[in-house]
């Protein structure tokens, strides 16, 4: 699995082979020679890279990021991607996200609900190269399906599915099977991996539109 152009493994102190992107610091992360440490324990996409999944991201991609929160992960994405549309529903995290975007001209924060793509369809370009999804809400598969309209025919969905957001009492493996079955209504699932030890009860998914 190759990393996208603009993502490298660098040395930070005594640690070698640490994921990093080149850009302005966003959340107090260590920076060495202009390279920002990308902590997989704080980032589902970072963990997906560490798990070795082929995301299809190559660098310079147009990205729709669903569930941007305060910008921790999407700040790294905007360091190596092209235009990056960052959708977040909660006003408080968006305040931080706006600050992150100040130093990233390719990052476009959107205070919108990922469950209602019609509210930002006039802003997001059609045919994006990738949808990166980290939406901790019930109906995660439905979010991916409803946003499929933005994805290029040869694009990729890179999602982190959280079992507890769907059902806090059910066995996570059963929840993931249900979610994958629903995703297959509009996607071909290419790869999956449980995200332990980085994130408990999460599943990384890479899929292409059907």
Curated annotation (Swiss-Prot):
Keywords: Methyltransferase, RNA-binding, rRNA processing, Transferase, tRNA processing. The keyword rRNA-binding does not apply. It comes from Halobacterium salinarum (strain ATCC 700922 / JCM 11081 / NRC-1) (Halobacterium halobium). S-adenosyl-L-methionine binds at residues 72-73, 88-89, 113-114, 134-137. GO terms for biological process: box C/D sno(s)RNA 3'-end processing; rRNA methylation; tRNA processing. GO terms for molecular function: histone H2AQ104 methyltransferase activity; RNA binding; rRNA methyltransferase activity. SUPFAM superfamilies: S-adenosyl-L-methionine-dependent methyltransferases. Pfam families: Fibrillarin. It is an enzyme of class 2 (transferase). Involved in pre-rRNA and tRNA processing. Utilizes the methyl donor S-adenosyl-L-methionine to catalyze the site-specific 2'-hydroxyl methylation of ribose moieties in rRNA and tRNA. Site specificity is provided by a guide RNA that base pairs with the substrate. Methylation occurs at a characteristic distance from the sequence involved in base pairing with the guide RNA. Its EC number is 2.1.1.-. Belongs to the methyltransferase superfamily. Fibrillarin family. The lineage of its organism: Archaea, Methanobacteriati, Methanobacteriota, Stenosarchaea group, Halobacteria. The keyword Ribonucleoprotein does not apply. Interacts with nop5. Component of box C/D small ribonucleoprotein (sRNP) particles that contain rpl7ae, FlpA and nop5, plus a guide RNA. This is Fibrillarin-like rRNA/tRNA 2'-O-methyltransferase. InterPro entries: Fibrillarin, Fibrillarin_CS, SAM-dependent_MTases_sf. The gene is flpA.
């Amino acid at each position: 699995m190759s990393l996208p152009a603009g993502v490298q493994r660098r040395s930070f102190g005594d640690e070698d082979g640490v994921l990093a992107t080149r850009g302005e610091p966003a959340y107090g992360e260590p920076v060495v020679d202009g390279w920002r440490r990308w902590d997989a324990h704080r980032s589902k996409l970072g963990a997906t890279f560490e798990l070795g999944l082929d995301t299809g991201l190559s660098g310079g991609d147009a990205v729709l990021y669903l569930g941007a929160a305060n910008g921790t992960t999407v700040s790294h994405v905007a360091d190596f991607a092209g235009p990056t549309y960052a959708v977040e529903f909660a006003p408080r995290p968006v305040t931080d996200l706006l600050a992150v975007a100040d130093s990233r001209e390719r990052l476009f924060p959107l205070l919108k609900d990922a469950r209602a793509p019609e509210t930002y369809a006039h802003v997001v370009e059609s045919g994006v190269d990738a949808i990166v999804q980290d939406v901790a809400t019930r109906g995660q598969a439905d979010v991916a399906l409803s946003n499929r309209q933005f994805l290029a025919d040869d694009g990729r969905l890179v999602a982190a599915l959280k079992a507890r957001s769907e059902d806090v009492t059910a066995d996570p493996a059963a929840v993931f099977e249900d979610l994958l079955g629903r995703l297959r209504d509009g996607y071909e699932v290419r790869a999956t991996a449980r995200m332990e030890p980085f994130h408990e009860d999460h599943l990384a998914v890479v899929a292409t539109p059907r």
